[in-house]
Swiss-Prot record:
Keywords for the protein's UniProt record, in alphabetical order: Ribonucleoprotein, Ribosomal protein, RNA-binding, rRNA-binding
Statement: the UniProt record of this protein carries the keyword Aminoacyl-tRNA synthetase: no
InterPro entries the UniProt entry points to: Ribosomal_uS11 (IPR001971), Ribosomal_uS11_bac-type (IPR019981), Ribosomal_uS11_CS (IPR018102), Ribosomal_uS11_sf (IPR036967)
NCBIfam families: PRK05309.1, uS11_bact
Pfam families, alphabetized: Ribosomal_S11
Similarity comment: family membership: Belongs to the universal ribosomal protein uS11 family.
Classification via HAMAP family: Ribosomal_uS11
Function field: Located on the platform of the 30S subunit, it bridges several disparate RNA helices of the 16S rRNA. Forms part of the Shine-Dalgarno cleft in the 70S ribosome.
Protein's organism: Gloeobacter violaceus (strain ATCC 29082 / PCC 7421)
UniProt name for this protein: Small ribosomal subunit protein uS11
GO cellular component terms, A-Z: cytosolic small ribosomal subunit
Domain of life: Bacteria
Subunit structure comment from the entry: Part of the 30S ribosomal subunit. Interacts with proteins S7 and S18. Binds to IF-3.
GO biological processes: translation
Length: 130
């Protein structure tokens, strides 16, 4: 009889990565924190939704803080000590996510705002009438 195969699971490779890049994408509805090594391979990620927040609470600074702490702890477990931070988006959790990465123990060497700004590109959505 044939051996049962492992169902499509990759073996997790534990690498020792001393430095990397933390990308914080902060929108009005959610905050996503992705930590990668210098090559660009993702080491850990977390979002406000994956941290247990639902609905409008995902857009809060506290949810961004929890997501950044979760991703930062996993990055530290893989040996990361310092990182550069790339922040994009207009959301409420930008600064709190950076502070949470510092509080978790990552040394931040650079903070760069990489929010895409159009040179008069697409027409923006109409204004809300509430």
């Amino acid at each position: 009889m044939a051996k049962p195969t492992r169902g499509g699971q990759k073996k997790k490779v534990r690498r020792n990565v001393p430095s990397g890049v933390a990308h914080i994408q902060s929108t009005f509805n959610n905050t996503i924190v992705t930590i990668a090594d210098t090559v660009g391979d993702v080491i850990s990620w977390a979002s406000a939704g994956s941290s247990g927040f639902k609905g409008a609470k995902k857009g809060t600074p506290f949810a961004a803080q929890q997501a950044a702490e979760s991703a930062g702890r996993r990055a530290i477990d893989s040996g990361m000590r310092q990182c550069e931070v790339m922040v994009s988006g207009p959301g409420a959790g930008r600064e709190t996510a950076i502070r949470a990465l510092q509080a978790v123990g990552l040394e931040i060497t650079l903070i760069r705002d990489v929010t895409p700004i159009p040179h008069n590109g697409c027409r923006p959505p109409k204004r809300r009438r509430v």
